Design a protein with these regions (language model features):
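NAD(P)H dinucleotide-binding glycine-rich loop of Rossmann-like/cofactor-binding domains
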Residues: 80, 90-119
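Conserved hydrophobic/aromatic beta-strand scaffold that supports enzyme active sites
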Residues: 17-22, 68-70, 102-104, 110
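Cytochrome P450 core scaffold surrounding the K-helix E-X-X-R motif
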Residues: 42-48
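Short beta-strand-to-turn element immediately C-terminal to the catalytic PLP-Schiff-base lysine
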Residues: 6, 47, 72-73, 104-105
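Glycine-rich beta-strand-centered segment in the early N-terminal region that forms part
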Residues: 21-38, 51-94
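Short N-terminal binding/cap micro-motifs at the start of the first secondary-structure element
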Residues: 10-15, 41, 79
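Short gly/ser/thr-rich secondary-structure transition/capping motifs
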Residues: 11-17, 50-53
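Extreme N-terminal starter segment of soluble prokaryotic enzymes
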Residues: 1-2
Length: 119
């Protein structure tokens, strides 16, 4: 999948588009096709290296930890969500963030987007 990643810490110039492989979906996770994400202070602080002692991840790192989209796949133990559900989420803070075409989210971190809100 395509994602915006960093391969080193630095200014906005270190952001680059790359092909990335996500880890496998676990039994309590869903795959979300992204329609929107956001830029928050944690994103630029991590990109510039201010949080590297707290999050000791290997590169590449996909930034972003907010998403709105549609579920395209569910793990084997997911019971409250199904393919096609429109959702908001604040995924776990991992090196696989939301500046990407799709993202993996634990099922307990999802919220349903009301039908009155379009994507």
């Amino acid at each position: 999948m395509k994602a915006v990643v960093i391969n080193q810490y630095g200014s906005k110039e270190v952001l680059e588009e790359a092909e990335v492989t996500l880890p496998k979906l676990s039994e309590h996770q869903v795959l979300v096709k992204e329609y929107a994400t956001s830029i928050n202070p944690i994103d630029w602080k991590l990109r510039e290296g201010y949080l590297k002692q707290m999050f000791d991840w290997s590169f590449p790192i996909i930034l972003g930890w907010d998403v709105a989209g549609v579920i395209t796949e569910v793990g084997s133990q997911v019971t409250d969500w199904q393919v096609g559900d429109k959702v908001f989420a604040r995924p776990e803070t991992t090196r696989f963030g939301t500046y990407a075409e799709v993202t993996i989210v634990d099922d307990h971190l999802l919220a349903k987007i009301p039908e009155t809100i379009s994507l």
